[in-house]
Amino acid sequence: MAVITVDFQLCFIFILVWLFSLFCLSAFFFKKSKDPQLQDCGLPPSPPSLPVIGHLHLLLSVPCHRSFQKISSQYGPLLHLRAFHIPIVLVSSGSMAYEIFRTHDLNFVTRDRTVPIMEKSILFGSFGFVSAPYGDYWKFMKKLLVTKLLGSHSLEQTRLIRGKELKTFCAMLFDKAAKNETVDVGIEMMKLTNNNICRMIMGRRCSEENGEAEKVRGLVTKSLSLVKKFLIASTVGRALKKLGISLFEKEIMEVSQRYDELLEKIIKEHEENPNKKEDRDMMDVLLEVCADDNAEFKITRNQIKALFVELFIGGTDTSAHTTQWIMAELINHPEILKRLREEIETVVGKTRLIQETDLLNLPYLQAVVKEGLRLHPHTPILVRNATEGCKIGGFYIAQNTTMIINAYAVMRDPDSWEYPDEFQPERFMVPPKRKEDEREQLALNYIPFGSGRRGCPGTNLGYIFIGVAIGTMVQCFDWRINGDMVNMEETGEMTLRMAHPHKCTPVARINPLASFESRNP
């Protein structure tokens, strides 16, 4: 059962929604669609609704992914919902998600701007890449990200950086083990991923000494809480977006200002001390494009800042919390932990630390990571918008319909996954002789990072972060917890987080760092 957090602001939103609905009864209740196809019987089935608000009460239930899963199991995998007069289609089937992400990818490549726009905010303004419309700016920025940061060649160039950070992380765990101190896995993983992201995109860590690193981590956490509030507020429909802005404007601008001050300082450092051509980071590349009047696309200073905010949030939070979930699953399933450790010791040995280059030779580790992402996708709800009317699963989807793809439900669908709620990495150990269509069927229902053109461009980096972190913690340590099992309760937030911090004590078993130091005095 999930832990649900209800604060005053969310209650206030709900009260305002009800008051607003009374004043707007005639406008919303009697509005008829002008699309003749909507008057046919081609729409997806719809569960019972309430007068005026439609299915709003279902959309505001938390945690959303579990609420949506319950609705779909009762009424079907493709459902037509309504928040006032706003059409919404809920998708809980892998085959229908495939139609959206592949067959009709261009039609659904635009993300519905559920979060209100504040022009002066680098957090929820119009400068971001993630929520940008599909067009020249989005294509240009994605190309830059792939070629300069997230592509295979770029990842190979920054491998040494991540290797050093992994050793620092491992040394910290050995220090905790020596002192018999408890580790908050989520917090320590957030530090590791934040250090990696910062060094990869701007050439240096955020300083722990002057509080800069803690400031970034705090901003990431605060940003995610604001996204949660806005997504819940925005489910009432486009008509209430301005209301949402008025409720949270002070918080948004405060966080945006803190991001702006931090990033402006970093930008000025790069401008005053530009890196040499052979040692350039992402910030250097972006500043060069910003200053180049002949660039393929002219980007602004605020767009650079907004991109870095998105990289901080996406790169830091996703890997940190997914690793926390997977370690909890491994501790709760000691037989799987044992098998994984045996694989690592067979391939890597005991005298050196696991490396990124080992991952391809560790199929069971890959399966463990995939199974963890299947059960605990960081973003369980994916949102798209229909640019034009089309048919999905034989049903008509009207233009401008908001599509909610419940990735959580798709990856726990009992029609597609055997024992869907159980942690079984073996399901991803696909034998080479298995038919190709079986492999495709597996991939069809596996969407932890989304899919299509709007799929997460940092998928490969995410697998690397999570894989080597899990590998290190399993290779070098046993883990002691209070009680027999890790508590697996979820929060009621928009991202899938553990309700209770995953705290455990590392117990050193082998120290490949000591072996390395003895060979390299």
Identify the role of each PLM range.
Residues D112-I122, E156-T323, R339, T491-E493:
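Cytochrome P450 heme-thiolate monooxygenase catalytic core
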Residues L359, I405-D437, N520-P521:
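Conserved cytochrome P450 K-helix/beta-meander segment immediately N-terminal to the heme-binding cysteine loop
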Residues H55-G76, E261, E269, Q355-F395, ...:
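Conserved cytochrome P450 K-helix E-x-x-R motif and the immediately C-terminal K′/meander segment
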Residues P334-I336, T459-A499:
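Cytochrome P450 heme-binding "Cys pocket" and the immediately downstream C-terminal segment
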Residues A2-Q37, I464:
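Terminal signal-anchor or tail-anchor transmembrane helices
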Residues P36-L59, H65-I161, V185, M189-N196, ...:
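Cytochrome P450 substrate-recognition site 1
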Residues M1-Q9, L19-F20, E288, T402, ...:
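C-terminal helix/juxtamembrane-tail motif
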Residues V309, V430-I466, T491:
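Cytochrome P450 heme-thiolate "Cys pocket" and heme-binding signature region
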